[in-house]
């Protein structure tokens, strides 16, 4: 396993990994925000009150 770090620079590899994970997290959150069920910013749509 230690020979892998001889091929790749650890600093650049970790920066690339964390950048990829951050972009992936943003993408997942924006996809969830675009749905009605998981949009926590606007809240669930409320049903109109029924009077009888």
Curated annotation (Swiss-Prot):
Q: What is its main location?
A: membrane
One GO MF term on file is:
electron transporter, transferring electrons within the cyclic electron transport pathway of photosynthesis activity
For the ligand (a bacteriochlorophyll), the binding residues are 29
Q: How does it sit in the membrane?
A: Single-pass type II membrane protein
* Record flagged with keyword Cell membrane: yes
Set out the biological process GO terms recorded for this chain's protein.
photosynthesis, light reaction
Q: What does this protein do?
A: Antenna complexes are light-harvesting systems, which transfer the excitation energy to the reaction centers.
Outline which residue ranges sit on the Cytoplasmic face.
Answer: 1-12
Periplasmic-side stretches of the chain, per the record, are: 34-52
Q: How does it assemble?
A: The core complex is formed by different alpha and beta chains, binding bacteriochlorophyll molecules, and arranged most probably in tetrameric structures disposed around the reaction center. The non-pigmented gamma chains may constitute additional components.
Stretch forming the signal peptide:
none
**Where is the protein found, in the record's own terms?**
Cell inner membrane
Protein's name in the database: Light-harvesting protein B-880 alpha chain
Note whether Cell inner membrane occurs among the keywords.
yes
Transmembrane ranges? 13-33
Q: Which UniProt keywords apply?
A: Antenna complex, Bacteriochlorophyll, Cell inner membrane, Cell membrane, Chlorophyll, Chromophore, Light-harvesting polypeptide, Magnesium, Membrane, Metal-binding, Transmembrane, Transmembrane helix
> What is any one of the record's Gene Ontology cellular component terms?
plasma membrane light-harvesting complex
Q: Which species?
A: Afifella marina
What is stated as this protein's family in its record? Belongs to the antenna complex alpha subunit family.
């Amino acid at each position: 396993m230690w020979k892998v770090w001889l091929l790749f620079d650890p600093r650049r590899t970790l920066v690339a990994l964390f950048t990829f994970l951050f972009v992936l997290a943003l993408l997942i959150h924006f996809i969830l925000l675009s749905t009605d069920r998981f949009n926590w910013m606007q809240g669930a749509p409320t049903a109109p009150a029924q009077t009888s």
